[in-house]
A protein has these predicted regions:
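Hydrophobic/aromatic-enriched cytosolic interaction surfaces used to assemble or bind macromolecules
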Residues: 1-250
């Protein structure tokens, strides 16, 4: 799943209410409705005076995910993409035809991760970067970028990855190094106080025989791991900054 970035690349993170740019202050985006339109349209001004090549990370709010079980009969990327399109059509209906879908391997015999993004978003990004004279080298979902950054610490272990974005959480479960589930859910500002309950409900929904108590939180604000551990001794929690992960080179 790794996509390597050169250290000299301009790295950009697009969130519903913010634009993160390596070596620069965060750009606040006003008047957005939670869609990608406002941050993307604010991008032209943020790129003024910059050249070279860039890698973009998209907030999970702009991405749909699905895990595809490994199937040895599927040999080519085209076959995997066809399966992914069928899955998204089943889940979301005809609008899936308007999405750009990519499938990536999580491990040699593990499930494939299918990611779908509005095709007009990709096309608009291409237009903006061309007009700015910047080569757009890659576009990557936040969850994928974050996992690539922490995958060595996860190894063949088990953990929850919790990604905080405005009004929502993305929850990804990894067991023994294998991706098991990805779920998105709404969340209010008090989600930190009930995170164990959230994960326990998700575990029950998935029918886990053994609890997974390691949690890696990608937070947009402060996350007090010491306080959390004092309240919930059974949980081992690590916190990473959302902005730092979005802009990190690998």
């Amino acid at each position: 799943m790794s996509l390597l970035w050169r250290n000299k690349q301009l790295r950009i993170g697009l969130a519903p209410d913010s634009i993160y740019i390596s070596g620069a202050k965060t750009v606040d985006v006003a008047g957005g409705d939670g869609s990608w339109t406002a941050p993307v349209e604010a991008l032209s001004a943020a790129l003024a005076g910059r050249k070279g090549e860039a890698a973009v990370v998209l907030a999970d709010q702009f991405v749909r995910y699905s895990l595809l079980a490994y199937n040895e009969t599927l040999k080519t990327p085209e076959q995997w993409n066809a399966l992914a399109l069928h899955r998204f059509n089943t889940l979301h209906g005809p609008r899936a035809a308007e999405w750009q879908i990519n499938v990536t391997s999580t491990s040699p015999l593990g499930p494939r991760l299918a990611c779908a993004v509005d095709r007009p978003l990709i096309e608009r990004l291409a237009t903006i970067f061309t007009a700015a004279g910047i080569h757009l080298a890659s576009v990557q979902p936040f969850l994928v970028a974050a996992f690539n950054r922490i995958r060595k610490t996860v190894g063949n272990g088990s953990c929850w990855i919790v990604v905080e974005e405005p009004g929502r959480l993305t929850l990804a479960l990894i067991q023994r190094g294998m991706w098991i589930a990805i779920r998105g859910r709404r969340a209010d500002k008090g989600w930190r106080n009930v995170l164990p309950e959230i994960l326990e409900r998700e575990s029950a929904f998935l029918g886990l025989s053994q609890p997974v108590t390691r949690v890696i939180v990608c937070a947009q604000g402060e996350f007090d791991t010491a306080h959390f551990s004092n309240l919930y001794e059974a949980w081992k929690t690590e916190a990473l900054g959302y902005r730092e992960l979005a802009l990190a080179s690998e």
